[in-house]
UniProtKB/Swiss-Prot annotation:
Keywords: Nucleus, Transcription, Transcription regulation
Biased composition (Polar residues): 76-87
Protein name in UniProt: Protein RADIALIS-like 1
Single GO cellular component term: nucleus
Alphabetized PROSITE patterns for the sequence: SANT
Pfam families per the UniProt record, alphabetical: Myb_DNA-binding (PF00249)
Residues covered by region (Disordered): 73-100
Source organism, top-level taxon: Eukaryota
Primary localisation category: nucleus
Physiological role: Probable transcription factor.
SUPFAM superfamilies: Homeodomain-like
Source taxonomy: Eukaryota, Viridiplantae, Streptophyta, Embryophyta, Tracheophyta
Species this chain originates from: Arabidopsis thaliana (Mouse-ear cress)
Amino acid sequence: MASSSMSSQSSGSWTAKQNKAFEQALATYDQDTPNRWQNVAKVVGGKTTEEVKRHYELLVQDINSIENGHVPFPNYRTSGGCTNGRLSQEEKRMRNMRLQ
């Protein structure tokens, strides 16, 4: 019974808390650390060694895609009132600024 609850806990998406623990564990356990993925999985909690390793591999793929220009930059400009004119005011200020 414990294994079924563990597998349901470990499958699926990652919580923000798990992602933060994952980042911290990667900083603690570098690639030369023996049993790196087991240690990372222990810190993250609720994930298997294989899931942690796969999560890392996907992260590396995402970084490579971004660095190779395969991911377009987002367009944050809006046309309309959702920013209540703040963006255009900020743009005006930036245009009037002079670098010293």
